[in-house]
Amino acid sequence: IVLLMVVTSNADRICTGITSSNSPHVVKTATQGEVNVTGVIPLTTTPTKSHFANLKGTQTRGKLCPNCLNCTDLDVALGRPKCMGTIPSAKASILHEVKPVTSGCFPIMHDRTKIRQLPNLLRGYENIRLSARNVINAETAPGGPYIVGTSGSCPNVTNGKGFFATMAWAVPKNKNKTARNPLTVEVPYICTKGEDQITVWGFHSDNEIQMVTLYGDSKPQKFTSSANGVTTHYVSQIGGFPNQTEDEGLQQSGRIVVDYMVQKPGKTGTIVYQRGVLLPQKVWCASGRSKVIKGSLPLIGEADCLHEKYGGLNKSKPYYTGEHAKAIGNCPIWVKTPLKLANGTKYRPPAKLLKERGFFGAIAG
């Protein structure tokens, strides 16, 4: 209960308020330090960890292809035969695979390129689609004619031999026609809506016996890609690979190195190669921007805010304390210490004498 006394006289004196009990509220002020007040409104909350959710008012993408069962996002990005599907549009995306890997196709040397980043690159776009046609006719590319190779490690939907939809394994029909001199193929821009074109390519290498059998050359091969001002060079490794399977596939003595290049609208890319090249086929056409945040699946319900440390948050207060991390959506602002808004008077103990002050003195106080 607050008792407010107002005494009116010729001097216009005003008395301060007093409470009938001790005040439990303390606020820190810029000029007076800690001050007891009769009431406060908390402005901060300390969240607890929760599951990630769909962001309210926008489409949120979890897996790149929700309907592609038993597929990692890298499987989808490379076009593994059994992982072909539609990627939904989204304004927000969850980075749920810290180290994405393929789960059932040809063994990839992940650490030699930036291929692990490909799913994250795609997540950063609002709209993503795979081109309907191939960017290059692999059978008649320079150095050909080629046979487009397949592998039992990449079974297609009918369980026959297959390969990634984004690449063609170019095996020369005449294996004795070695590519001693580098060959160059231009990669045209084929997206139709002014999107960024993400072109996937790579190369295959194996032990000396397999290299001679497939390509008629056991020497290390050289490869270069160039697009949008970025040039990358590789030299293949010959042999030294233990037999490896991925997801109960066939054992393979060889490895593939996979990379990608981003082509802006109307810009042509180039690939310089020798034997064992994986020529680009279907390309990703991507546009718009999607905000990306590290998180986990499944997405349950909706939330105002997605926070890397706390998951889905609903904004009950304008500020929060606790762990500071990246957040997207309608999020509270991080502060180091709790904030309070005083909505009462400055507390005066009842036993103290009320000090009368002039009108302007009361305002200044």
From Swiss-Prot:
Sites where a glycan is attached: N36, N70, N156, N176, N243, N314, N343
UniProt keyword Transmembrane, yes or no: yes
UniProtKB keywords: Disulfide bond, Fusion of virus membrane with host endosomal membrane, Fusion of virus membrane with host membrane, Glycoprotein, Hemagglutinin, Host cell membrane, Host membrane, Host-virus interaction, Lipoprotein, Membrane, Palmitate, Signal, Transmembrane, Viral attachment to host cell, Viral envelope protein, Viral penetration into host cytoplasm, Virion, Virus entry into host cell
Membrane topology field: Single-pass type I membrane protein
Signal sequence, renumbered to the chain: 1-11
Molecular function GO terms recorded: host cell surface receptor binding
Subcellular localization(s) per the UniProt record: Virion membrane; Host apical cell membrane
GO CC aspect terms: host cell plasma membrane; membrane; viral envelope; virion membrane
Record's comment on post-translational modification: In natural infection, inactive HA is matured into HA1 and HA2 outside the cell by one or more trypsin-like, arginine-specific endoprotease secreted by the bronchial epithelial cells. One identified protease that may be involved in this process is secreted in lungs by club cells.
The organism's place on the tree of life at top rank: Viruses
Note in the entry: Major glycoprotein, comprises over 80% of the envelope proteins present in virus particle. The extent of infection into host organism is determined by HA. Influenza viruses bud from the apical surface of polarized epithelial cells (e.g. bronchial epithelial cells) into lumen of lungs and are therefore usually pneumotropic. The reason is that HA is cleaved by tryptase clara which is restricted to lungs. However, HAs of H5 and H7 pantropic avian viruses subtypes can be cleaved by furin and subtilisin-type enzymes, allowing the virus to grow in other organs than lungs.
Subunit structure: Homotrimer of disulfide-linked HA1-HA2.
Protein family: Belongs to the influenza viruses hemagglutinin family.
Protein name: Hemagglutinin
Organism (species): Influenza B virus (strain B/Singapore/1964)
